[in-house]
Amino acid sequence: KSLLIQGYNYTDDYIDSFTVDGQGGGNLYVSSPQSGGGGSVCCVSFNQGVPLPIKLKVRWMGAYCMEYETNMFGRTSAYRKGLWREAEALAVDLSQGKPRAMEVHIFPEGHVEAAITPGYSPPRMVLPRTEKYQRPGSPKTYPDCTDDQLQQATP
């Protein structure tokens, strides 16, 4: 059986991309009191006979730093570089026998929770969001990239 992937972003930053066991989950704006920040995308495999909870590997691009490049004319341009984070989550079954979605909840400190559900659930954290899809008071400036961050490959 295939389950829809539904993401919930409780961090202060836009998540450019996330995956669940290698399956693309799309992008996620910061959550609002009514929404997790993204829609549903297809799909992650689920075998109903497998013992639960299921261990999942979740990766997301949700941290950023500034990278600078100087061209041959001496002009320097700044670019926002996305940095990948990764966590394991144990997916629990909350579907009441009607599995339709795999929810992935990404919390500010990098903790991830997952659940198999019968459909869309309300966010687990109720956080404010501005009309520009940002957290109120969250600065949108990023630190300069370190050498290690500049070496991080983008999958």
Residue ranges and their predicted role:
Residues F18-C65:
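Tryptophan-paired
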Residues D16-T19, T70:
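Short, hydrophobic/aromatic beta-strand segments
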Residues Y10, S45-F46, Y68, D148:
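General secretory precursor processing signal
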Residues D12, V50-L52, Q96:
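Solvent-exposed loop and beta-edge segments used for protein-protein assembly and interaction
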Residues K1-L3:
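Beta-strand-rich domain onsets/edges
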Residues D13, Q48-G49, N71, Q151:
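Secreted/processed peptides and extracellular or luminal domains of membrane proteins
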Residues W60-P155:
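Beta-strand-rich cores of mature extracytoplasmic or soluble domains
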Residues I5-D13:
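Structural motif
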